Amino acid sequence: MKSVKVFAPATIGNIGPGFDVLGLAVDGLGDFVEAREIPGHKLVIEDIFNADHDISTNPDKNTAAIAANEILRMFNIRKGIGLIITKGLPSGSGLGGSASSAAAGAVAINELCNGGLSNDQLIQAAMKGEAYVSGGYFADNIAPSILGGATLTQSINPLKVLKLGSIDELIIILITPKIQILTKDSRDVLPKNISRSAFIENMANTASITAAFCNNDYSLLKDNLRDLAIEPYRSKFIPGFDKVKIAALDSGADGMAISGSGPTVFAITNSKKKAKIIEREMVHEFNNHGIECNMLITVPSKSGTRIIKAN
């Protein structure tokens, strides 16, 4: 029987000031979903590997399976399908773990059904999966995970997503403190209103970062990686955030921000030598607050969700 294995990359939601709008796929991290035809007419989750906590095997409560079933609905097909999910991303890390699983699930079933769906349809199906855990429809993680590179979500309904490109010089230092922040909780803390000055600066910074990825311009990114609207509220969930940011900048980083809803934070540089120093100092500061971390020095992933193996 036919089978396919798919990889979907991790993502940085918001890229600083671009709340719910900007997102970036990163290399070296992500989730795998293997889908295979089985007897019967239902989709089932056969196994889940490397999960850091209990992830439901109920297809109605699993992001990959929800996205997969949505693809089947789009094709108007009922068939037996078994899913095997291998997690490469911790839950509640701010690296788009639920989005990655949903993206992989959507693309895997599209391939199993001989393809034909557009990127927009794949994004819509994956958003339905992620909505189960995030509480709403957002594409700032889903879109870059499927498309690769940086993306801009203009609207959700109707769906309008632009692929912006990448920045060749960009080196990303990802630090994930070993604490969990749920997306729903991090949204509840956000203010209903922000100051005019914060709004204006975030608009300018978001526009500049958009231009940076469109023009492969590292200097434009580093000069505008500042978030005055959301970071002051979400950073309260991350112990030692302010000191970690100071440590990053003092050790040569050109900017630091929260990845998505956190707790992962990311710093940027265009120097491999500096990247190792920045990583060391950020981890050291988290350790000073009694927090262990996972860390990775990486680059943007120009490729999005992709087929690893097909039989």
At which residue positions do the language-model features occur?
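Short beta-strand
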Residues: G255-S259, I297
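Catalytic-loop motifs flanking and including active-site residues across diverse enzymes
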Residues: D60-T63, G97, S101-A102, N205
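Active-site-proximal alpha-helical scaffold in enzymes
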Residues: A99-G116
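Short, hydrophobic/aliphatic alpha-helical segments
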Residues: M1-G13, K79-G88, A126-G135, P239-G252
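ATP-dependent small-molecule kinase catalytic core of the GHMP/sugar-kinase superfamily
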Residues: S118-D250, K272-N311
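Short Gly/Ser/Thr- and Asp/Glu-enriched loop/turn motifs at secondary-structure junctions
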Residues: G80, A139, I258-P263
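Short hydrophobic/aromatic beta-strand micro-patches
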Residues: F266-N270
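ATP-binding N-lobe of GHMP and related small-molecule kinases
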Residues: M1-S93, E111-L117, G148, S301-S303, ...
